[in-house]
Amino acid sequence: MIDFLTDFSFSLHFSQPTFFFIGVYYYLYLKGIYKINMQRKIHQELSLLFAVLLAFYFYPFYNMKGQVVMIDVGQGDCFFIQQPFHKGNILIDTGGLKNTDVATKRIIPYLESQGVFSLDAVFISHQDFDHCGALESLKTHFKVKEVIESFKEKRIGNLHFKNLALDKRYVSENDRSSIIYVTINHLNYLFTGDISQEVEKDLYQTYQK
């Protein structure tokens, strides 16, 4: 039997457990131990424990809220967008530090704690290291379906992303950042990369209507 099972390779990924889940788990576990000591059957406890594990495993897929989070990457930007019901998981920029692997030390642990084990897209606003330096490590250690560096409009799941970057030829690389606009849960978000006040003024004059 052991030799048979070793032929199969699979794993289950769970998000970070909540206090409620931990409490229910240990309640059922201790109740089961008590019944075993009393030489009583534990079918009910096993069934409930299995149901709790199943519900916890699928929790990200029936989460109605979604979220927009700025991940602490030390220097630079890294925003995580999760659509309701696991319809899309997206990063905008990755951050980057010269002496630390930000992807394996900060980004991936956070994503896995949220029950996220692949990314539908990673947007890169511009090529400064503190905005894209962790990208290669992230692609090596994590499933990334698409990297988007230059675009006008992009739909991912239920979200419609627009790049509001102006056609003016700015000298600075920072001022040529993608300016990503998206509406999430009736709130408008603008991710501006590293643009200067000059570009902010130009942006306001262009889109103030």
Q: Language-model features: where?
A:
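Short loop/helix-cap segments at secondary-structure boundaries that form the rim of catalytic
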Residues: 6, 60-62, 80-82, 139, ...
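Conserved beta-strand hairpin/beta-sheet module of binuclear metal-dependent hydrolase folds
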Residues: 63-109, 113, 174-196
